[in-house]
Amino acid sequence: MAHIYRLLLLLLSNLWFSAAAQNQSETEWPLHDNGLSKVVQWDHYSFQVNGQRIFIFSGEFHYWRIPVPELWRDILEKVKATGFTAFAFYSSWAYHAPNNRTVDFSTGARDITPIFELAKELGMYMIVRPGPYVNAEASAGGFPLWLTTGEYGSLRNDDPRYTAAWTPYFANMSQITSKYQVTDGHNTLVYQIENEYGQQWIGDPKDRNPNKTAVAYMELLEASALENGITVPLTSNDPNMNSKSWGSDWSNAGGNVDVAGLDSYPSCWTCDVSQCTSTNGEYVPYKVIDYYDYFQEVQPTLPSFMPEFQGGSYNPWAGPEGGCPQDTGAEFANLFYRWNIGQRVTAMSLYMLYGGTNWGAIAAPVTATSYDYSAPISEDRSIGAKYSETKLLALFTRTAKDLTMTEAIGNGTQYTTNTAVRAFELRNPQTNAGFYVTFHNDTTVGGNQAFKLHVNTSVGALTVPKNEGVIQLNGHQSKIIVTDFTLGKRTLLYSTAEVLTYAVFENRPTLVLWVPTGESGEFAIKGTKSGKVENGDGCSGINFKREKDYLVVNFSQAKGLSVLRLDNGVRVVLLDKAAAYRFWAPALTDDPIVQETETVLVHGPYLVRSASVSKSTLALRGDSVEKTTLEIFAPHSVRKITWNGKEVKTSQTPYGSLKATLAAPPTIKLPALTSWRSNDSLPERLPSYDDSGPAWIEANHMTTSNPSPPATLPVLYADEYGFHNGVRLWRGYFNGSASGVFLNIQGGSAFGWSAWLNGHFLDSHLGTATTSQANKTLTFSSSILNPTENVLLIVHDDTGHDQTTGALNPRGIIEARLLSNDTSSPAPGFTQWRIAGTAGGESNLDPIRGVFNEDGLFAERMGWHLPGFDDSAWTPENSTTSASSALSFTGATVRFFRTVVPLDIPAGLDVSISFVLSTPSAAPKGYRAQLFVNGYQYGRYNPHIGNQVVFPVPPGILDYQGDNTIGLAVWAQTEEGAGIQVDWKVNYVADSSLSVAGFGKGLRPGWTEERLKFA
């Protein structure tokens, strides 16, 4: 009876859904453009380019977090290989503007034109996001730090001072982008204005009471973009569902963009999920969010667009080593990205797709050096299960042209034979193609549920699979079941196995389907009467059953790749998940909208970067990390295969594919890290030290523009004096006696400081993961006081400027107050303060590496971290012949360790290397260390607070065919001193078209005598 009842419900619901579909198909949604061009248009369904609809599946990368331009190709080729149609990037105002007189888009890795050119070459659209504010877990949210003094107002408004500051950068960024727009045959699709600036309304957005300041600010940015040549649509991204800002469907109050979008991080943007409760509520793993109703309410005539959807999460200070990939891994990618499709989203960009590294002082205080983000492409540039899982869906969305125009017909458990499973039905009103997106009814439950699905098709209502087997949801999983799916000139009536992709060769489709290993599947193709098994690798229980208008094929797929041939010429490739992970569909065109005739199919390698056909030769570029069997499905005209420029011996299979074998790459062994030398890097603690040179500035400001004034004068905020990064040194002078000093210092989460009087160590604030300001009362022993002049040295490390409204939070000494020896006499005052920071301050002494790279340690000011510095007079450290070195000293001070190590990595390989820093078990942990590689600061190691120990350093920063200068600045914050173990390791070796040997020429300038004046 229960079964009959479900069938009756299905019949009734089918009648209602058919009527609903008819009504929806009759809806005339307006087709929008920006009034400047009709190249890019959009409507209720999706974006269109030159009249073709496109599913925008995009991912974010930050060029400024991987400052080796040759490696941008690596990242973007990996993005393209997933099947993505676009990529997005923030530009960084701070990265291009070392001071308020300079905008640099030409020096070293600041020239971003290769990114635009790669987009055209590789065939991907771009979502360009210039800010000027970008957030991004970057210091001050990407604002240049000279902006944070208060001199330019409170920021992110229409204040003329702030407007004058951002205009040169924003104009430059717009002018560069204007040369590479879709409207002129290039690939910039849209241009985002500001970032997560949900400030259009005062109070409840439903009241539509405009925030005139915010409106004016947005209009200034929009006008600047247009004045400087932007002709593609302008977009925005709401930070959450509450702000409802800048969309014309909601209101015409002013400041609106062409297409408004919504950002969402349903599993929290940080490994510390408690930080997301105010936005998402209590964290429940795999709990999904309803976006459909939001888009229907807020922007019904616009595409459902998510400029940022969760691609991972950043790891805060004190977070787990390696981040929290288990929170947003392959299962997350499988479920949440399909959930978005079920919500009718047709444009989404993953934040991040590749995170990179917070080298130098790029990071905001919320995170340490790694910006791996648990993204599909890891910080060390490797790809794994999450990348592959994302690829399974991205290739499908590139192939499923009918998915770009659908209406939501219904959803619920009535679609299935198991009430623990529900489905969302999407249907194309023009072609009647259907997409049933299935989930556990409670997505937080990850059990194994079996079911059959009630579907509407062109031959009527069916319950599938019709024959043997069931559909399974095993774990946190979703599946998209298609009906009346366009297959060239054929029709896939339905498939309970997911479609990966398809291609058409000689007018005959090759359809690729996949199921999790060991599961069964069933599909039906119209106009077919019979079929046969041509290769049964892992496939079993294959049954062909002819129906009136179609052929039903039922199968079970274990590990491997199987091939079926149908009598109407359709070839079907069946894969289990492991095989699907190694299956690729490289495009033969540079058009992001890839047609089914413009691709080949490849199985086996770790990565296929590109493919091209010339006469009878198919040229493949890619990576292999082990001995691999290469199998290719291509046009019959292809007879030869080249892999990375070399012809490989091929054989043809009985079912028409070509096979070849790729050899394993060689093993790479790194030389030992030995022959270390060291030197004292804190002479400033000594009373005899002379601070009258160019490195030092008198800190004598008696007023400040900062909205948070200090408790004592002079103003001891580092940014006031042009020193913005990391470690700054303060020398305070006073005469006569004092019993101590009260210090209150602010530096961001995980910051720290230490103090010395007349060369004698006093105390330190070691820091905690959550403390951004700390005060101490330090007592002076009479034995270390001088009767006349005394010098107090404070070494202060900050971890960047806060984001959003916290960008103006000062960095430095909030209060410095000497204490009297007795209550009857007043406390002495400081007679002078001097400050040292980055050599040259804002003058950008090293324009290649830039102002974020260095801070104020003596070693850095003197250039000890740079290639070519002569350390022959330094103290040799005990060396070993092992691959690692243990470096140690006693006493509270700063010491710099240095060695030079040659590398000779062969051409034709992509090799990834990481440094590993650790503290020996018996050594103290009260220290901070910075890792330098050929002059670049590529690691902040703080064992007292943080857990990051692995620091990837890319080729180009490392010289793979030459000498490498490795430096460590170690700041012991206690008298126990410090001990640090230094190792390095190979992450992977790939035979690759990306031959990284020789990368980075010109990016590693050496030491010059100019450094000596900053002693």
Curated annotation (Swiss-Prot):
<dbReference type="InterPro" id="IPR025972">
    <property type="entry name" value="BetaGal_dom3"/>
</dbReference>
<dbReference type="Pfam" id="PF10435">
    <property type="entry name" value="BetaGal_dom2"/>
</dbReference>
<feature type="binding site">
    <location>
        <position position="137"/>
    </location>
    <ligand>
        <name>substrate</name>
    </ligand>
</feature>
<keyword id="KW-0732">Signal</keyword>
<dbReference type="Pfam" id="PF13364">
    <property type="entry name" value="BetaGal_ABD2"/>
</dbReference>
<keyword id="KW-0964">Secreted</keyword>
<feature type="glycosylation site" description="N-linked (GlcNAc...) asparagine">
    <location>
        <position position="23"/>
    </location>
</feature>
<keyword id="KW-1015">Disulfide bond</keyword>
<feature type="glycosylation site" description="N-linked (GlcNAc...) asparagine">
    <location>
        <position position="411"/>
    </location>
</feature>
<feature type="binding site">
    <location>
        <position position="135"/>
    </location>
    <ligand>
        <name>substrate</name>
    </ligand>
</feature>
<feature type="glycosylation site" description="N-linked (GlcNAc...) asparagine">
    <location>
        <position position="878"/>
    </location>
</feature>
<feature type="glycosylation site" description="N-linked (GlcNAc...) asparagine">
    <location>
        <position position="441"/>
    </location>
</feature>
<keyword id="KW-0119">Carbohydrate metabolism</keyword>
<feature type="signal peptide">
    <location>
        <begin position="1"/>
        <end position="21"/>
    </location>
</feature>
<comment type="function">
    <text>Cleaves beta-linked terminal galactosyl residues from gangliosides, glycoproteins, and glycosaminoglycans.</text>
</comment>
<protein>
    <recommendedName>
        <fullName>Probable beta-galactosidase B</fullName>
        <ecNumber>3.2.1.23</ecNumber>
    </recommendedName>
</protein>
<feature type="glycosylation site" description="N-linked (GlcNAc...) asparagine">
    <location>
        <position position="100"/>
    </location>
</feature>
<dbReference type="InterPro" id="IPR031330">
    <property type="entry name" value="Gly_Hdrlase_35_cat"/>
</dbReference>
<feature type="active site" description="Proton donor">
    <location>
        <position position="196"/>
    </location>
</feature>
<feature type="binding site">
    <location>
        <position position="90"/>
    </location>
    <ligand>
        <name>substrate</name>
    </ligand>
</feature>
<dbReference type="InterPro" id="IPR037110">
    <property type="entry name" value="Betagal_dom2_sf"/>
</dbReference>
<keyword id="KW-0326">Glycosidase</keyword>
<feature type="binding site">
    <location>
        <position position="265"/>
    </location>
    <ligand>
        <name>substrate</name>
    </ligand>
</feature>
<dbReference type="InterPro" id="IPR008979">
    <property type="entry name" value="Galactose-bd-like_sf"/>
</dbReference>
<feature type="glycosylation site" description="N-linked (GlcNAc...) asparagine">
    <location>
        <position position="172"/>
    </location>
</feature>
<dbReference type="InterPro" id="IPR036833">
    <property type="entry name" value="BetaGal_dom3_sf"/>
</dbReference>
<comment type="similarity">
    <text>Belongs to the glycosyl hydrolase 35 family.</text>
</comment>
<feature type="glycosylation site" description="N-linked (GlcNAc...) asparagine">
    <location>
        <position position="821"/>
    </location>
</feature>
<dbReference type="GO" id="GO:0004565">
    <property type="term" value="F:beta-galactosidase activity"/>
</dbReference>
<dbReference type="GO" id="GO:0005576">
    <property type="term" value="C:extracellular region"/>
</dbReference>
<keyword id="KW-0378">Hydrolase</keyword>
<feature type="glycosylation site" description="N-linked (GlcNAc...) asparagine">
    <location>
        <position position="735"/>
    </location>
</feature>
<keyword id="KW-0624">Polysaccharide degradation</keyword>
<feature type="disulfide bond">
    <location>
        <begin position="271"/>
        <end position="324"/>
    </location>
</feature>
<feature type="glycosylation site" description="N-linked (GlcNAc...) asparagine">
    <location>
        <position position="775"/>
    </location>
</feature>
<dbReference type="InterPro" id="IPR017853">
    <property type="entry name" value="Glycoside_hydrolase_SF"/>
</dbReference>
<dbReference type="Pfam" id="PF01301">
    <property type="entry name" value="Glyco_hydro_35"/>
</dbReference>
<feature type="glycosylation site" description="N-linked (GlcNAc...) asparagine">
    <location>
        <position position="211"/>
    </location>
</feature>
<feature type="glycosylation site" description="N-linked (GlcNAc...) asparagine">
    <location>
        <position position="456"/>
    </location>
</feature>
<feature type="glycosylation site" description="N-linked (GlcNAc...) asparagine">
    <location>
        <position position="554"/>
    </location>
</feature>
<keyword id="KW-0325">Glycoprotein</keyword>
<dbReference type="InterPro" id="IPR001944">
    <property type="entry name" value="Glycoside_Hdrlase_35"/>
</dbReference>
